[in-house]
Amino acid sequence: MMIMRKXHPLLKIVNDSFVDLPTPSNISSWWNFGSLLGICLVTQIITGLFLAMHYTSDTATAFSSVTHICRDVNYGWLIRYMHANGASMFFICLFIHVGRGIYYGSYMLSETWNIGIVLFLTTMATAFVGYVLPWGQMSFWGATVITNLLSAIPYIGTTLVEWIWGGFSVDKATLTRFFAFHFILPFIITALVLVHLLFLHETGSNNPSGLNSNSDKIPFHPYYTIKDLLGVLLLLMVLMILVLFXPDVLGDPDNYTPANPLNTPAHIKPEWYFLFAYAILRSIPNKLGGVLALILSILILALFPLLNTSKQHGLTYRPITQFLYWIFIANLLILTWIGGQPVEYPFTTIGQMASILYFSIIIIFMPIASMIENDILKLHF
């Protein structure tokens, strides 16, 4: 008799994706982050569902409903902080996952890579609308500032902003629709994840050597299920340490003040995971130019497969591009720091220089470095 997991129509899909999947034998722990993102997504959906049971998306009661969750609901504080800090863990895993893709040349699997970019943008949109829901000062002003950027679009900008707001300012209609978006988007993300995996399993995984690994594959279970389980335990440990010991360390104190349209906070800034993009936005004095730079800071990822001039897959044996890669990572950290600083000298100048470097490394320096490496190694085929 055939094993059920291999013959059953539904179990067969699960089996081919998580059990009998042929996997390169040498993939390192940097490949764990895909499964960790899956765990983050499931955690966020579950905690989010329980929060939605007690939350009210009305300007008069939103802030107090979050307070009620933390004070009166059984383990409400735990669910709320797991959800808030879970978002931070989600983005940490996301950044590492994308960083690994850039380092090891995974962008050459272009369908998987492009769906990944769509996933990244959708996750950013979800996190943004979610941050508005507690209806604190930073929620309100963050929503006002970021949605207002759309007014930079010529001709239709102002109409578009008012259409998104559902009125002439961020108000009850805005909060209600943002809650609706925040509820539906994770399920859209889940569907996109399945497409992401579908495309990945068409080609198979990349590996640290950058060489074809078809001759040396091992089953996903038990080898990588155990390896992923270690990652999951470490992730949950870090998350719970964050939640139980320093739950507010990544948040903004201003968000403990109820939203007040008549009082602007001294420094309006988004959550830490958006600061790099916010710094790029602020580094351009022109409104439309800033918005375009903001969008391009993410969409530039789509250029990686097109700008690849190297004859080798990944940066494992390419020291010059490796050096540029780590400068790029350091530059990203500088942008994150600048995004959280006030708009004054010297921060503006540092931000402008870091923004120029961000785009220059990807568009100019990396392709040139790859060509130099080809030349040194005489890879002219």
Swiss-Prot record:
Q: What does the record list as GO biological process? A: mitochondrial electron transport, ubiquinol to cytochrome c
Q: Which UniProt keywords apply?
A: Electron transport, Heme, Iron, Membrane, Metal-binding, Mitochondrion, Mitochondrion inner membrane, Respiratory chain, Transmembrane, Transmembrane helix, Transport, Ubiquinone
Q: How does it sit in the membrane?
A: Multi-pass membrane protein
What role is this protein assigned? Answer: Component of the ubiquinol-cytochrome c reductase complex (complex III or cytochrome b-c1 complex) that is part of the mitochondrial respiratory chain. The b-c1 complex mediates electron transfer from ubiquinol to cytochrome c. Contributes to the generation of a proton gradient across the mitochondrial membrane that is then used for ATP synthesis.
User: What family classification does the UniProt entry report for this protein?
Assistant: Belongs to the cytochrome b family.
Q: Which organism is it from?
A: Eligmodontia morgani
- Identify the Pfam families for this entry: Cytochrom_B_C, Cytochrome_B
Look up the record and name the cofactor or cofactors this protein needs: heme b
**Which amino acids does the record list as binding a ubiquinone?**
H201
GO CC annotations on file: mitochondrial inner membrane; respiratory chain complex III
Q: Its quaternary structure?
A: The cytochrome bc1 complex contains 11 subunits: 3 respiratory subunits (MT-CYB, CYC1 and UQCRFS1), 2 core proteins (UQCRC1 and UQCRC2) and 6 low-molecular weight proteins (UQCRH/QCR6, UQCRB/QCR7, UQCRQ/QCR8, UQCR10/QCR9, UQCR11/QCR10 and a cleavage product of UQCRFS1). This cytochrome bc1 complex then forms a dimer.
Protein name (record): Cytochrome b
GO function term, MF aspect, one: metal ion binding
Further details from the record = Heme 1 (or BL or b562) is low-potential and absorbs at about 562 nm, and heme 2 (or BH or b566) is high-potential and absorbs at about 566 nm.
**Chain positions recorded as heme b b566 binding sites:** H97, H196
By its UniProt entry, which InterPro entries does this protein fall under?
Cyt_b/b6_C, Cyt_b/b6_C_sf, Cyt_b/b6_N, Cytb/b6-like_sf, Cytochrome_b, Cytochrome_b_C_euk/bac, Cytochrome_b_N_euk/bac, Di-haem_cyt_TM
